[in-house]
From Swiss-Prot:
Name of the protein in question: ATP synthase epsilon chain
Organism lineage string: Bacteria, Bacillati, Chloroflexota, Chloroflexia, Herpetosiphonales
Molecular-function GO term, any one: ATP binding
Gene of this entry: atpC
One cellular-component annotation, GO: proton-transporting ATP synthase complex
Family statement drawn from the similarity comment of this UniProt entry: Belongs to the ATPase epsilon chain family.
HAMAP family in the record: ATP_synth_epsil_bac
Keyword Cell membrane belongs to the record: yes
Pfam families in UniProt: ATP-synt_DE, ATP-synt_DE_N
Job of this protein: Produces ATP from ADP in the presence of a proton gradient across the membrane.
Length: 136
């Protein structure tokens, strides 16, 4: 019995598909979801979201959000979500370099926190893009 997975951002429905398993970066650690999982609501942190369908793992870069789990449905409300083939590696690398520079130039703890979040997002995007490149 598959799980209905929906990944939604403010701009669009990124994915609506039946899958075999979902793995997401919760603030409490990585969470794996299989069919008939107990209901769960959790906060997601920036990281790699994977789903498995027919034995193939598909990675997405997400920048945080929420995940609602019902026995046969998972809904991801993400700040942003990108498939590996949607990521521009050059732009992601530029964002990583800018975030590192912002961390060095910080003026306050808020600046540092923003720069750390930007660095994490850029790093995740690069990791997911690398997964795509390694599969080709």
């Amino acid at each position: 019995m598959p799980i209905q997975l929906e990944i939604v951002t403010a701009e669009r429905v990124v994915l609506s598909e039946e899958v075999d398993m979902v793995s997401a970066p919760s603030v409490e650690g990585r969470v794996g979801i299989l069919p008939r999982h107990e209901p769960l609501l959790t906060v997601l942190q920036p990281g790699e979201l994977h789903y498995v369908k027919n034995g193939v793992s598909m990675p997405y870069a997400i920048s945080g959000g929420f995940m609602e789990v019902l026995p046969n449905r998972v809904t991801i409300l993400a700040d942003t979500a990108e498939r590996a083939d949607e990521i521009d590696e050059t732009r992601a690398e530029q964002a990583r370099l800018q975030a590192e520079q912002a961390m060095r130039d910080r003026q306050s703890t808020e600046d540092l926190a923003r720069a750390e979040i930007a660095l994490r997002r850029a790093t995740v995007r690069l990791q997911v893009a690398k997964l795509r490149r390694n599969r080709q």
